Design a protein with these regions (language model features):
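Short hydrophobic beta-strand element within catalytic cores of glycosyltransferases
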Residues: 90-93, 97-104
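A short, well-ordered alpha-helix in the C-terminal region of glycosyltransferases
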Residues: 132, 139-153, 163-166
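Glycosyltransferase donor-sugar binding loop
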Residues: 22-36, 52
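Nucleotide-activated donor-binding/catalytic signature segment of Leloir-type glycosyltransferases, i.e.
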Residues: 36-55
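Conserved acidic donor-binding segment of nucleotide-sugar-dependent glycosyltransferases
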Residues: 105-123, 132-137
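Aromatic "clamp/platform" in nucleotide-sugar-dependent glycosyltransferases that forms part
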Residues: 73
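A conserved mid-protein helix/loop that constitutes part of the nucleotide-sugar donor-binding site
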Residues: 1-13, 33-36, 124
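Conserved active-site histidine-acidic residue motif and adjacent donor-binding/catalytic loop
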Residues: 50-62, 121
Length: 180
């Protein structure tokens, strides 16, 4: 469940504190009513430097971005975070699903931090994390490299297939072939 309104409010706070910031909200409209509420909110807050892109070629568009933001209320393993990391872009996410693990790794992972994680629907925390991300190009580059390294190590197609095969073998050994 996406929470674009919190992102809009957080960006409004951020843009009142920092100059030359822009927010691009990527993707098509799944819920017309919610989209209309978001457009109305942008108009009500009189935000000028926010763009709703509609559907775009993510790979091409990623080159224009300094970092990405995911403000979901509920999530499993968000593909958008992995896409961001593949493009060497750090992320600001809400603490849902496996976002924290994607950003910080799991035990034994020494790739480093790849972004900031904030509680869902916490606009002040989100604005602060966005501001920290905006403040340092060097930090963004370092975090982007960390995310890309983590993605290459754990989420490449070949590795995923290998991990699933390993899991199936373990299940087969424990419960027999008929169970699979």
């Amino acid at each position: 469940i996406k929470d674009i309104k919190t992102m809009i409010y957080a960006f409004y706070e951020l843009s009142s504190r920092m100059e030359n910031v822009r927010l691009h909200i990527l993707g098509g409209v799944d819920d017309e009513e919610y989209a209309d509420e978001c457009y109305a909110l942008v108009k009500q807050l009189d935000i000028k430097n926010l763009v709703f892109t509609g559907r775009v070629d993510i790979v091409q568009y990623m080159r224009k971005l300094d970092f990405t933001i995911l403000t979901s209320i509920s999530e499993g393993q968000p593909l958008s975070v992995l896409e961001s990391f593949a493009a060497r872009r750090p992320c600001v996410t809400t603490d849902v699903g496996c976002c924290r693990e994607l950003l910080n790794g799991k035990e034994g992972d020494d790739f480093g931090c790849a972004g900031y994680c904030v509680p869902p629907m916490y606009r002040d925390g989100l604005a602060a994390a966005m501001e920290k991300m905006c403040e340092s190009r060097r930090r963004r580059i370092r975090m982007g490299k960390s995310g890309q390294a983590r993605t290459k190590a754990y989420y490449r197609h070949e590795r995923m297939i290998s991990e699933y095969r390993k899991l199936y073998r373990e299940v087969e050994e424990a419960y027999g072939r008929d169970w699979i």
